[in-house]
Amino acid sequence: MEKNIATLIDRMVTDRKLIVRNPTRLSWGDSEMCDALFRTLFRRLDATIATYHHLPEYDEVIDWMHDTRGVGLLLIGDCGRGKSIITTGLVPVLLGMKEVSVYAVHADELNKPYPFAASTMGMDPKTSCLDYLTRCPCPIIDELGVEPMINDYGERYEGFNRIINAAERYGRP
């Protein structure tokens, strides 16, 4: 019976009638290597830092770098803790190291045109940042919680919900 189920699932996946969730785990090395990489990137991405001060919450990001476990990263905390540097700089560089091209979007810009739509293969030049984030392999949003309601021909909705639904549907982190 187990073999029949496996065969059925394989056939349905091949016929594109079924999606099997299979999270992609990423790692940028052991804990020491990730710590060194984090510190190097953080310093390079913010030239205003005179002296780097390692904050306790950075250790959680470094743990995620060691093994993402196929999940994304949600950063919450007080102002001035480095969330935007991590979100808009560090994570895109890390993903770039894994050949994943991403663009971090500020939450205020969800309904604005995606600036690289014309140069992104297959994208309509009128694509919004919201549409980009629903299609991108690893959506990155800075300043979540300040995003405006989206008005689509009179229908108002929260764009973040569309991004989360797409990520869940397609098994994205």
Which role does the model predict for each range below?
Residues 73-75:
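Hydrophobic anchor at the beta1->P-loop junction of P-loop NTPases
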Residues 80:
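Walker A (P-loop) phosphate-binding loop of P-loop NTPases
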Residues 1-69:
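A short, basic N-terminal segment
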Residues 92-139:
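AAA+/P-loop NTPase substrate/partner-engagement loops
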Residues 68-69, 133-136, 168-171:
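Short loop/turn elements that form and flank the Walker-type P-loop nucleotide-binding site
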Residues 86, 90:
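Hydrophobic positions on the alpha1 helix immediately C-terminal to the Walker A/P-loop
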